[in-house]
């Protein structure tokens, strides 16, 4: 099969206060990429009783209004022929790692379970995937918990982003951008998942919170039969993906013909 190599930034986090910038974000993506999974970020910083800043979800009515606005925009873009997927970031209780949840259609609702296993159950039987990112941070501090991993729900992982490389805990590309979440650990890194016997692909993507498609923060390549949502979703399910940190290097590989 002669697959098309399609490019995107699969980790564009848009916040509540940025929703009015969505058309501008899309304009940039449309000029640079072939498809776009966007991840709504339902979290904000608040002060606790001691004055310490903590991250918490926006009020539910705010989130649901934004989700419907994102749905409307995605359907408009899809109708115009551009393959866009809507999604959101899920963090739960911080014990299983952060995952971006994406749906094939535009009809799913956001779920807020505290644990990854319950997130998987919430979308059982539906065309939904959850992609872990910045995996190598500490366990229970938003690093990946391989003990709870589901390779069907999470067919690939984000090995590189603006946070750095989660491949292992001693590679040359460190994770020092957010030191409060570090350091990297061998217990949660990507190599540990392979050592545990899981089968999953890898991507790179930005983890951008101000604009999509930032050079140097990572891009995802998807090898698909065509540039449609159906073909792209099928390719992602089959783990036909890879990632680059900077330039869009084209790679074609086969196993067993």
Regions found by a protein language model. Name each.
Residues 1-257:
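Extended, charged catalytic domains and RNA/DNA-binding interfaces, predominantly
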């Amino acid at each position: 099969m002669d697959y098309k190599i399609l490019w995107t930034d699969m980790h564009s986090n848009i916040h509540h206060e940025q929703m009015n910038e969505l058309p501008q974000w899309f304009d940039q993506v449309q000029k640079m990429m072939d498809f776009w999974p966007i991840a709504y970020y339902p979290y904000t910083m608040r002060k606790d009783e001691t004055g310490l800043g903590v991250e918490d979800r926006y009020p539910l009515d705010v989130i649901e209004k934004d989700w419907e606005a994102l749905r409307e925009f995605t359907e408009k873009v899809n109708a115009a022929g551009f393959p866009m997927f809507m999604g959101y970031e899920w963090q739960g209780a911080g014990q299983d790692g952060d995952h971006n949840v994406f749906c094939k259609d535009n009809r799913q609702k956001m779920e807020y379970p505290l644990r990854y296993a319950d997130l998987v159950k919430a979308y059982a039987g539906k065309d939904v995937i959850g992609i872990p990112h910045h995996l190598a941070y500490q366990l229970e501090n938003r690093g990946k918990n391989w003990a709870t991993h589901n390779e069907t729900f999470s067919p690939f992982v984000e090995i590189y982003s603006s946070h750095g490389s989660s491949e292992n805990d001693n590679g040359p590309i460190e994770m020092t951008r957010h030191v409060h979440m570090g350091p990297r650990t061998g217990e949660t890194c990507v190599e540990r998942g392979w050592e545990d016997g899981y089968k999953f692909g890898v991507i790179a993507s930005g983890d951008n919170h101000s604009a999509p498609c930032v050079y140097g923060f990572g891009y995802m390549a998807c090898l698909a039969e065509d540039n449609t949502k159906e073909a792209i979703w099928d390719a992602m399910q089959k783990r036909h993906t890879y990632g680059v940190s900077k330039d869009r290097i084209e790679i074609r590989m086969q196993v067993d013909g």
